[in-house]
Amino acid sequence: MRLFIAINFTTKVKKQLYQIIKYLSKEAIKGNFTKTSNLHLTLAFLGEVSSNRVQDIMKVMNQNAMDRESFEIEIGGLGKFINNGELLYWYGIRENETLTNLQHALIRGLKAYEFSVDDKPFKPHITLGRRCRMNSDFDENKFAKIISPIFMEITTINLMKSEYKEGKLTYTSLGEVKLQG
């Protein structure tokens, strides 16, 4: 199973993010834009994991998240990564020490259980669109200025499974840990 630990967004936040994606997609010649149901914030990517290790992952999540207070994040700031000449657009998360500490604790916990995890510096972001090619008159700075920050209280984290169903990428929650608050 292909697994990751994530923060899932409320329906309200997903609708707000979808409006940004919709506007961005209108400015694109091509691109693969994130479905509303797949919007999330990845905390730890595990990749392919045997189903008999799911309980270990849930144990790590409980040990490192259950006693933490809920907290608020601010979503804002358009950015992009360039990969082979194609763009991946994302919406960032403003610097948040509580979020970063949670992510670092999860990575340490997963490593203690001998999971292979990506430990590149944490750059929290929400993927809006992959393999994008934009209209020549698309002004990223102008676009970035018209989108407002989004705020959300973080009360849970989820273990997510990524799979293709009927040719579509689908994310399913396998377990949830509630934060205090």
Each model region followed by its residue ranges:
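Histidine-dependent nucleotide/RNA phosphoesterase domain, centered on the 2H-phosphoesterase fold
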Residues: 1-181
